[in-house]
Amino acid sequence: MQKFRIGIVGGAGYTGGELLRILLNHPQAHLQFVLSQSQAGQPIYKTHKDLLGETDLTFAAALPSGKEWEDVDVLFLCSGHGQSEQFLATETIPSDIKIIDLSTDFRNQSNGFVYGLPELQRETIRQASRIANPGCFATSIELAVLPLAAAKVLKSDVHVSAITGSTGAGQALSASTHFSWRNNNISIYKAFTHQHLAEIGQSITAL
């Protein structure tokens, strides 16, 4: 069975932790390195407690260099929104390495990235070298709406009520992400202006 050698940039956050959990349990995935400048040198399980006993890897302080890149097939970018574009502008990644970005930076399919919703364009994604992972709200809404749009049965406006958890805001603290505020509470979040609306419109237009 083929093994894909994988590197992760930004592995200390919530997105990186969940990706690590999935990859460590995937039979075709082999982790080569997990980069985190804030946790460099620390065991991964110290940050992601649920991975205790799953891996002995420590967070890397720097990217591979030179021929070390030959041991990497796929690179995941799990940095915050706006950081992936900056990362690729300043770092030289060999062109034969597939890049999968989990931020919002390339979901508009800029810079050679393909929008990574398999239900929309599975074969295109298979051939792509750069893939932009869809947003959470966008994915859930597209899976419901795109089949209706493709069948041309959408005759009026679509109204969606969606609720996200605390982790959607990342690890950085703010007044509205504390448990004492979130517990048993709900609030309106970017109604009619959410950034995922552009993704959904783009996908519908592509049909």
Summary of predicted features, one role per range:
Residues 192-207:
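Oxyanion-binding "anion nests"
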Residues 1-191:
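N-terminal Rossmann-like NAD(P) cofactor-binding subdomain of oxidoreductases
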